[in-house]
Amino acid sequence: MLLDDRKLKILQAIIDDYIYSAEPVGSRTIAKKHELGLSSATIRNEMADLEEMGLLEQPYTSAGRIPSDRGYRLYVDQLMKIDELNECEIEKIRSDMNIRINELSQLIRSASAVMAKITKYTSMAVSPHMKKSVLKSVQVVPIESGKALVIIVTDANIVRNNLIRIPESVTPAFLIQISNMLNEQLKGFTLEMLKSDILNEKFEKLTALPFRLIKPILDGIEELIITIDNPEVYLEGATNILNFPEFKEVDKAKEFLNILDEKKLVSDLLTNSVNDNNEIIIHIGNENAMEGIKDCSLVTASYSVGNHVIGTIGIIGPTRMEYSRVVSSMNYIRNKINQEILKLLDNG
């Protein structure tokens, strides 16, 4: 959509003012606050044109104008200036994310918390998708007679464990022997390669030990791999939405909070909102497919191991969002996550 310079400046002034005030913006306000060199009457005529073009709306007669979803889209794509984070905000992010972290899920949880704190919106994050992760080590640790703990560690230092039942005749020495064999044979495999038929075939051929003693351990590994492939969802600041006048109606706020309670919905929302170009993605209002968030904007970014996207972080709030602030915060935090992932890998 092509707009002349005058219309663009007026649209930007209206959106900037509305984001700050949450009140419809009138032509006199624009004429007084912004040095556009235009009369109130001229601005009013331009606002009428912008409304006709679908970029502004008038919530009620005699009110000023507010941006439509299309207006916000044009603002984000063409007019928004990305603010740099100030030193205080940067230090806050660094201090919150520089705590001793030795596991990737812990890092993502920490990042989600700091995003909500910095932006004052609701933050969401999905823990890493681990199909492509490489197995670094396997341990089978005796717990008590008839029980053992299978522990696997990936190349991204993600640790998972599973309590399994084993024959009571199995000794700790046998479990050490099995652990050594598992590491020798499985280290370096990606998790998606470790299916039950591969595991069974590999160990039936490789060992003279009774397969009935090994089978519960292999089953335990497969169960762990299945759970790893069901990523966790982290939410912070869910009730922040109640601080915005757009959500003062109880039913509207309730619908939003109910969606956040559905972890599968949130996971799908984030997973479906990324691309392969490592860009920050912004979905505004009706651009969101989910009915309960059509009055919201969703901003998402992916984080990576090397060139592989393994997870997503996001911010959700009203369409009257401080987009510049959110984008700058998310970009910094996403880069920080990627840096910390490299540290975890180097230390692993």
Curated annotation (Swiss-Prot):
Keyword Zinc-finger: no
Keywords attached to this entry: Repressor, Stress response, Transcription, Transcription regulation
Keyword Repressor included in the entry's annotation: yes
Any one GO molecular-function label of the UniProt entry: DNA binding
InterPro entries in the record: GAF-like_dom_sf (IPR029016), HrcA (IPR002571), HrcA_C (IPR021153), WH-like_DNA-bd_sf (IPR036388), WH_DNA-bd_sf (IPR036390), WHTH_HrcA_DNA-bd (IPR005104), WHTH_transcript_rep_HrcA_IDD (IPR023120)
Cystines in this chain: none
Signal sequence range: none
Pfam families: HrcA (PF01628), HrcA_DNA-bdg (PF03444)
Superkingdom of the organism of origin: Bacteria
GO biological process, one term: negative regulation of DNA-templated transcription
Function in brief: Negative regulator of class I heat shock genes (grpE-dnaK-dnaJ and groELS operons). Prevents heat-shock induction of these operons.
Family: Belongs to the HrcA family.
Protein name: Heat-inducible transcription repressor HrcA
Species of the source: Ruminiclostridium cellulolyticum (strain ATCC 35319 / DSM 5812 / JCM 6584 / H10) (Clostridium cellulolyticum)
Organismal lineage: Bacteria, Bacillati, Bacillota, Clostridia, Eubacteriales
Gene: hrcA
